[in-house]
Amino acid sequence: MKNLFRISLLALAIIFTSCSDDDDNQTLPVETNTIVDIVAGNPDFSTLGSALAITNLTSVLASEGPFTVFAPTNDAFADFLTANGFATLEDVPVDALASTLLNHVVGGAVNAADLSTGYINTSATFNGEADAPLSMYVNTSEGVMLNGISSVTTADVSADNGVIHIVDAVITLPSVVTFAAADAATFSELVGALTRADQPDYVSVLTTANGTAPAPFTVFAPTNQAFADLYAELGVAGIDDVDGAILTATLNTHVVAGANVRAEDLVTGTVATLGDAVEIDATMATITDPNGRTSQVIVTNVQAANGVIHAIDTVLLPQL
């Protein structure tokens, strides 16, 4: 009987030892807190989660990154669908939806305090060209405003692979007009000229989607200071004092239609615009108008979905 008891204890010890070894060798699942995990765990991101799944971008935002994601809420997506005439998310063309989502993603983990007013690159691209990332205009004068249409409502939601900033509107793919309107500190005078009542409907033309003529556009955009210098040169008080026909011819001279010409693709020579031709010196980054007046390119490659903007320091005039 004693021997039987000892054998039973020995067997029990072996079983416990075996179980203990199994527990020691068992690999426990590692909990993650990626951007995708946060989206999945927040009911106010359910539409965003569905959009990522539809476009096969879920795996991208679950990868190592790091990424900064400006994440629209369900209400933001609802407003986007209504504004664009879509009944459901599934009605949005997949390629367009994917580009729109990528327009909310920036490489690197950037906290709100590290954002400053100016242009940054998103993960969306012009016409699928990797070397032509779409720009985003960030305005930090009052909170964080993106492209003039979307505000950060909750910042710095930390993830294992980056950071999320919650926004109140979908950041739609920008046109060249988007940046002119959003960057008022630089381009408000240009916007005033483009929208003057006696001028052609430049806004409608310059919001033409890429793939539809006359898009894409290359716009040489004079800054506010450039316009101030022009008013002094012409001896007028402001844009309202410029003759209508001259203003139209002047604005046309700043737009190249049918081409998205980034700074690295500019070549020296004569370039046709919607108005008079201009002379470009690619080496010096200058543009000379028909009157021999020279303008310096001071900001390059503000990339929209339907063209590119290069800011210049002098207004180009047509042949006077």
Describe these PLM feature segments:
Residues 3-7, 19-320:
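Mature, structured domains of secreted/extracytosolic soluble proteins
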